[in-house]
């Protein structure tokens, strides 16, 4: 585990990282003071930028993780069909809404400027919450979503464009929605029947 404060030009080892632990995914709080780490050996750890990492027992091992991009105290996690929320900078998590019948949540993406607005791509579809993950709405006609990202909106003062590698109405492809998933036009790019997250 290493940290950079200059856009990746240089890196400094985290002084509190445990020995022999590597890999996995990291989520950093909106203010940069808290780090949540889903490690390569399926541990869930949390720390500040200098303190020793401690295990998070209230989030299942191997969970998909993310941070809210506006609320520095909020982190998200997903495991199976369950979604989890932390309001204390990743120290503890409580269960929130459900992700249908999903068993593989692939990615959690938070709105860049609106707290509590979060998306989850899973093996059974694409899910959206506007209340910090307390409840979710499934996006219509999406039966599988391997990846999701939010990008620049099509015009000023609009919701971010949603890009998804997904299966919509039975057709796999790269899709874009410009109205928060209300409608998803024909796919952009190559079509396919399967993909990997």
Question: Would you name each region that the model predicts?
Answer:
Residues 25-31, 64-70, 107-114, 147-157, ...:
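Structural signature of eukaryotic scaffold interfaces centered on beta-propeller domains
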Residues 102, 140-149, 183-197:
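Conserved blade-ending motifs and adjacent loop-strand segments that build the rim/top face
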């Amino acid at each position: 585990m290493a940290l950079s404060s200059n856009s990746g030009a240089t890196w400094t080892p985290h002084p509190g990282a445990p020995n022999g632990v590597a890999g996995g995914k990291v989520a950093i709080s909106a203010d940069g003071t808290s780090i949540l780490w889903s490690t390569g050996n399926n541990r869930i750890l949390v720390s500040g930028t200098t303190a020793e990492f401690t295990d998070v027992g209230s989030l299942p091992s191997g969970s998909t993780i993310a941070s809210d991009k506006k609320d520095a105290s909020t982190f998200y996690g997903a495991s199976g069909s369950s979604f989890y929320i932390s309001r204390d900078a990743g120290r503890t998590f409580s269960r929130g809404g459900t992700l249908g019948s999903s068993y593989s949540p692939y990615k959690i993406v938070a709105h860049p400027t609106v707290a509590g607005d979060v998306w989850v791509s899973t093996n059974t579809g694409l899910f959206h919450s506007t209340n910090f993950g307390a409840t979710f709405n499934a996006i219509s006609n999406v039966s599988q979503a391997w990846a999701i990202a939010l990008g620049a909106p099509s015009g000023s003062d609009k919701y971010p464009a949603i890009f998804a590698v997904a299966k919509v109405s039975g057709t796999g492809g790269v899709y874009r929605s410009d109205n928060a998933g209300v409608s998803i036009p024909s796919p952009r790019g190559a079509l396919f029947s399967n993909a990997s997250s």
